[in-house]
């Protein structure tokens, strides 16, 4: 009888391998577990049997019934899952949209220049300060040798927020603040160097080379024995680092309220190497900034003793430097957020 049970199991496994559908599986299950199946007949016969294997036959029969039922149930569940997966795959709706390719940002040419200037001067021990957008009339004008009513103020007509506060017309107000701070500092040993970078505002008409708002760099170097030779070295150092070692500078006498002596600084034309072209107006030189030794009166107005300390200074427009460095002909290009224009600087410095 046990051999018969094993034979039924082997036959079931063989038949199940041929089954392809749920209906065929249910039919096979009924034929093996139904009331008239061989297994059912074996179990019925055990009631009147007195064989010694009665218990073993009963256990084997029930185990086979359980095996057949669970195996067919698993088969049916697998067939149903495969059918459902196939149906879902055939009915799948693509709810996605083609993504928009994000543009990689690039450094703005003004930021490139600011970062280069910062590196150039921090390498030789200068501090980097942020200029104030809003400043008092005192530090913007009076402490820089531009008292109330001085005609030179007309060149820097600006917006007054109130009677004592203005939008900064130049970053040189930081020179006044630093000089005043150092004069009050008991620990000041007589030497200090910094550059200040900030936005400035003028009542200028906008055109290809002028803007009512722009960025300015101001340098200040205080020392006990500062001379014009130091100023010339700093100017050459900065210009060669910004525009290349082949660049030369030229100093022309000038007049500024903050400095005495004062000079305008020109650099040799990058395009023609000083030979003369339309860029430099056939002079071979391009004006870039104004500089000089801080006026004794400015030192006194800020609490400094000009007999003990002297200082050099210069001021330059960041936009002016960027336009010369990158060959930009119109200052408006720096403010219009033209992506096509700005992408030109994507790989600068790499």
Swiss-Prot record:
Any one Gene Ontology cellular component term annotated for this protein: cytoplasm
Enzyme class: ligase
Name of protein: Phenylalanine--tRNA ligase alpha subunit
Cofactor field: Mg(2+)
Gene3D superfamilies referenced in this protein's UniProt entry, alphabetically: Bira Bifunctional Protein, Domain 2
Localization in the cell: Cytoplasm
Organism, as annotated: Mesoplasma florum (strain ATCC 33453 / NBRC 100688 / NCTC 11704 / L1)
Family statement drawn from the similarity comment of this UniProt entry: Belongs to the class-II aminoacyl-tRNA synthetase family. Phe-tRNA synthetase alpha subunit type 1 subfamily.
Superkingdom of this protein's organism: Bacteria
One GO MF term: ATP binding
Binding note for cofactor: Binds 2 magnesium ions per tetramer.
Major localization listed first in the record, in broad terms: cytoplasm
Substrates-to-products reaction catalysed: tRNA(Phe) + L-phenylalanine + ATP = L-phenylalanyl-tRNA(Phe) + AMP + diphosphate + H(+)
Pfam families named in the record: Phe_tRNA-synt_N, tRNA-synt_2d
Keyword entries, A-Z: Aminoacyl-tRNA synthetase, ATP-binding, Cytoplasm, Ligase, Magnesium, Metal-binding, Nucleotide-binding, Protein biosynthesis
GO BP terms in the entry: phenylalanyl-tRNA aminoacylation
Keyword presence, Translocase: no
Listed EC numbers: 6.1.1.20
Record note on quaternary structure: Tetramer of two alpha and two beta subunits.
Keyword Aminoacyl-tRNA synthetase belongs to the record: yes
Annotated Mg(2+) binding sites: 260
């Amino acid at each position: 009888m046990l051999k018969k049970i094993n034979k039924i199991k082997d036959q079931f496994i063989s038949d199940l391998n041929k089954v392809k559908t749920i209906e065929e599986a249910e039919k096979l299950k009924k034929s093996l577990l139904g009331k008239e199946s061989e297994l059912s007949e074996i179990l019925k016969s055990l009631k009147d049997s007195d064989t010694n294997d009665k218990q073993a036959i009963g256990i084997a029969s029930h185990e086979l019934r359980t095996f057949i039922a669970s195996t067919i149930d698993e088969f049916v569940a697998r067939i149903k899952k495969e059918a459902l997966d196939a149906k879902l795959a055939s009915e799948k709706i693509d709810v996605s949209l083609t993504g928009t390719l994000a543009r990689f940002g690039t450094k703005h040419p003004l930021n490139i220049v600011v970062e280069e200037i910062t590196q150039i001067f921090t390498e030789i021990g200068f501090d980097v300060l942020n200029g104030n957008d809003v400043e008092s009339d005192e530090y913007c004008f009076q402490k820089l040798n531009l008292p109330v009513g001085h005609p030179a103020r007309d060149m820097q007509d600006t917006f007054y927020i109130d009677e004592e506060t203005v939008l900064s017309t130049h970053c040189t107000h930081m020179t006044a603040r630093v000089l005043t701070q150092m004069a009050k500092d008991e620990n000041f040993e007589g030497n200090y160097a910094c550059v200040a970078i900030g936005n400035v505002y003028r009542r200028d008409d906008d055109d290809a080379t002028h803007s009512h708002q722009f960025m300015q760099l101001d340098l200040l170097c205080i020392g006990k024995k500062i001379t014009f030779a130091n100023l010339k070295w700093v100017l050459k150092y900065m210009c060669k680092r910004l525009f290349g070692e082949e660049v030369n500078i030229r100093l022309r006498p000038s007049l500024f309220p903050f400095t005495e002596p004062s000079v305008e600084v020109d650099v040799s034309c990058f395009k023609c190497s000083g030979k003369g072209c339309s860029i430099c107006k056939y002079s071979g030189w391009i004006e870039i900034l104004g500089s000089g030794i801080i006026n004794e009166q400015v030192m006194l107005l800020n609490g400094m003793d000009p007999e003990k300390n002297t200082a050099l200074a210069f001021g330059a427009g960041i936009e002016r430097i960027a336009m010369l460095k990158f060959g930009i002909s119109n200052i408006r290009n720096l403010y219009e957020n033209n992506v096509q224009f700005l992408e030109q600087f994507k790989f600068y410095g790499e």
